[in-house]
Amino acid sequence: MVSQTVSVAVTGGTGQIAYSFLFSLAHGDVFGLDCGIDLRIYDIPGTERALSGVRMELDDGAFPLLQRVQVTTSLHDAFDGIDAAFLIGSVPRGPGMERRDLLKKNGEIFATQGKALNTTAKRDAKIFVVGNPVNTNCWIAMNHAPRLLRKNFHAMLRLDQNRMHSMLSHRAEVPLSAVSQVVVWGNHSAKQVPDFTQALINDRPIAETIADRDWLENIMVPSVQSRGSAVIEARGKSSAASAARALAEAARSIYQPKEGEWFSSGVCSDHNPYGLPEDLIFGFPCRMLATGEYEVIPRLPWDAFIRGKMQISLDEILQEKASVSL
């Protein structure tokens, strides 16, 4: 039985990530099995036929939670009165394209989306950004939507967290459920910071199970950092199904939190407990409070290895921010 209904927008609705995510969303994986969904699926003009096909499949899925499905090429219609938005659509990096070119193209897209959110979305709407470069895209959208709460903008680092979680599980030869406090800091890029020093295995410090520090620093960390490129090289396309699952999990950690769960998210750095510059979207370990708000987990120690990686990631975020104009 549906106890409430949320209005949700998904952009990039004809893309691979959205295609996987929409069915997970419709099944109740994000908001729960008692929450109805008023769904708006957006993509750019020219995609109308493909959007209609996505709607057909959702209709054919006969999902009880879907109260309404609207497909549109209007951001105003997509974002009108929404409770949550999943900003998936972006320009992918093409052959010969420099990162600065990608930042410029996507900066324009997310500035436009931020302005539309500012005009039409609910003030307390939660915004989950997936399109890369995700930290900077999220920052651009946030700063173009000053009416919305800055704390409710999230850049997805959950896929990085999941990759690290899986690698630690395999190395320790334990179930995924035995591994906890997996943390990824900083930028979602090859300079992200997979922080194994906080992780627990069977509620014990990781070093008691994985004593090989060289493997952690020189195999695991760079493997997580470069996993996206490895997937592209292997399948010829970027991560889609795993990214969609990570997005569903990232949102579920906020809407249906587990007691004591840590999750990594790129959030606004204003008033952060680590003294990092404000007005950034930076990956932090977070947890939900009884109030329904999240907090950045404070007072986690950084050893020399992690501190060095943190500075590299911070410098990259600052460089990206400096390269775009609001």
Curated annotation (Swiss-Prot):
It catalyses: (S)-malate + NAD(+) = oxaloacetate + NADH + H(+). One of its GO terms (biological process) is malate metabolic process. Keywords: NAD, Oxidoreductase, Tricarboxylic acid cycle. The active site is at 188 (proton acceptor). The keyword Cell membrane does not apply. Its EC number is 1.1.1.37. Belongs to the LDH/MDH superfamily. MDH type 2 family. Catalyzes the reversible oxidation of malate to oxaloacetate. This is Malate dehydrogenase.
